Amino acid sequence: MAFLLHQARFYTTVNHLRDLPPTVQPEIAFAGRSNAGKSTAINVLCNQKRLAFASKTPGRTQHINYFSVGPADEPVANLVDLPGYGYAEVPGAAKAHWEMLLSSYLATRSQLCGLILMMDSRRPLTDLDRRMIEWFVPTGKPIHTLLTKCDKLTRQESINALRTAQKGLDAYRDQGVQGKLTVQLFSAMKRVGLDEAHELIESWVRPSVADEKSEPVAQ
């Protein structure tokens, strides 16, 4: 099966909101803790080995990286790799810059149509993960959580992790959050959940195509 994300390439990197590209294509943001496997997940989803880079020093990268998706001469979307968060040794000034950059981008970027939130399946819904959710939910746009590294869990542990994350997300719905909050297990190493993630992301950037696929065949 051919996936749209397999046509991905580096587009640009920015360090300030004023430098965000004036593109009109829909954007899918990827966020997560510095050790949640975000870069690895992006590379696997895009079927490339070195599209997204993880800093050798966790938390060091404070830039927003853009990857265009679709035909090179007529891209249909952008994947947006947000800076990793949660590394304790990052200086205070860098943390402040991170908070301003991410919170403002998530709250105000009109092209943004959904957030892919990476959480280590062994440590889901940390305080910083919740902060990311709370920055984004006022937009009413969907959040899809990938519980990464699920290959490191037993089957029962995976079930428990999924239930824990689902329960945490349900609490936001109980508070009246309008946007969709969904979650799945994911392993870049074992390629668990890859098709499910592909299909969901493509449904965000090409909803008309997704609707056509879901329509029953006329008899």
UniProtKB/Swiss-Prot annotation:
Start and end residues of each EngB-type G domain: 24-207
Domain of life: Bacteria
Keyword terms of this UniProt record: Cell cycle, Cell division, GTP-binding, Magnesium, Metal-binding, Nucleotide-binding, Septation
Pfam families, alphabetized: MMR_HSR1
Keyword Hydrolase set for record: no
Alphabetical list of InterPro entries matching this protein: G_ENGB_dom, GTP-bd, GTP-bd_ribosome_bio_YsxC, P-loop_NTPase
Binding site for Mg(2+): 39, 61
Entry GO terms, CC: cytosol
Keyword Cytoplasm: no
Sites where the protein binds GTP: 32-39, 59-63, 81-84, 148-151, 186-188
Cofactor(s) the record lists: Mg(2+)
GO biological process: division septum assembly
GO molecular function ontology, one term from the record: metal ion binding
Function: Necessary for normal cell division and for the maintenance of normal septation.
PANTHER family with a match to the protein in the record: ENGB-TYPE G DOMAIN-CONTAINING PROTEIN (PTHR11649:SF13), MSS1/TRME-RELATED GTP-BINDING PROTEIN (PTHR11649)
Family assignment from sequence similarity: Belongs to the TRAFAC class TrmE-Era-EngA-EngB-Septin-like GTPase superfamily. EngB GTPase family.
Protein name: Probable GTP-binding protein EngB
Organism field: Burkholderia lata (strain ATCC 17760 / DSM 23089 / LMG 22485 / NCIMB 9086 / R18194 / 383)
Encoding gene per record: engB
